[in-house]
Amino acid sequence: KNIWLEQLLESQLLFEAWAHEACFIPIEDYALHRSYSNVRRHWGIHGARRVWEQHRPHMEALLEHVRHKGAVKSSDFERKDGEKGGGWWGWKDEKRWLEAWFALGELMIARRDNFSRVYDLAERVYPPARNYTQHPVEEVHQIFIARAVKALGIAQARWINDYFRTTPKVKQSELYPLLDEGTLIEVRVEGWNQPALLHRDHLPLARKAAREQLNASHATLLSPFDPLVWDRERARVMFDFDYRIECYTPEAKRKYGY
């Protein structure tokens, strides 16, 4: 339920940031994601840097406003008569600037009021943000690789980077340390022409699966954006399941409609 996410956000157990896309992330991972944000090539962060370069004086003034006046919502700023918003959603300038500061880490989402984001200084929302530990990019990569494989259950190397949208593609040399220490295990999957990767925490489950001792207990309806199926190539290989979100498909190629 949305209310659960909002409660966890306001309780500072989660925070919002650009990861795979706009995500809720456990607060204990704040330093990891902030450390990686400086090299992340995600469009949300790249766009925020461009907005800052184009509107730096206005953005600095807005940041000072938040610093002295406190948390704000975009609705606190009135659109001037006849003014049209910019960008894809027709946002007013202040909304674009708030979102840019959020993507760049200066602002965080303190809570949501009726789905509207409430922005405040990062150090007021989460005090450790002022002096978080800067992790080397290589260390963050190793952590993200291990967590991605664990989340995916079983994975081919080419699927790993999409989980946290890390770049570039995972190299074999990055897998060796995790394989050597036993965090990841190479396994064979019938019908695959390359080794698969399994997190060691899933080894007991994999052994049960190999003995055909796992039984489905229930069915559920998934969003097309669910991590289980958002990688279409993985869904095809894993489940022989192919789909296309038709709102993103040219009209002439749609089967079912928008």
Task: Annotate the PLM regions.
Residues 1-258:
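Long, charged, low-complexity, helical-prone intrinsically disordered regions
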